[in-house]
Amino acid sequence: MEELILSIVKPLVDHPEDVVITPEETDTSLTYKLSVSKEDMGRVIGKQGRIAKAIRTLVYAVGSKNDKKIRLEIIE
């Protein structure tokens, strides 16, 4: 899953070396925390959050095969 997120996000940003994904797992969910540089935050979120929503939709669709709920948080 991390490879999928990286393959989507890295081409969008100017500083791909600053892209970091941190997984956090609980009994019922798996949360991926995506961190990008401040300069690239707008590119990842997009106008009215459209790009972020599209990334989340793909992650949720792929993760729906698991028993755990998958979440993606974009943090600074």
UniProtKB/Swiss-Prot annotation:
Residues 29-76 form the KH domain. GO terms for biological process: cell wall organization; peptidoglycan biosynthetic process; regulation of cell shape. SUPFAM superfamilies: Prokaryotic type KH domain (KH-domain type II) (SSF54814). The keyword Cell cycle does not apply. Signal peptide: none annotated. It is found in: Cytoplasm. Keywords: Cell shape, Cell wall biogenesis/degradation, Chaperone, Cytoplasm, RNA-binding. GO terms for cellular component: cytoplasm. InterPro entries: KH_dom-like_a/b, KH_sf_prok-type, KhpA. GO terms for molecular function: RNA binding. Its main location: cytoplasm. PANTHER family: RNA-BINDING PROTEIN KHPA, UPF0109 PROTEIN SCO5592. Forms a complex with KhpB. A probable RNA chaperone. Forms a complex with KhpB which binds to cellular RNA and controls its expression. Plays a role in peptidoglycan (PG) homeostasis and cell length regulation. Belongs to the KhpA RNA-binding protein family. This is RNA-binding protein KhpA. It comes from Listeria monocytogenes serovar 1/2a (strain ATCC BAA-679 / EGD-e).
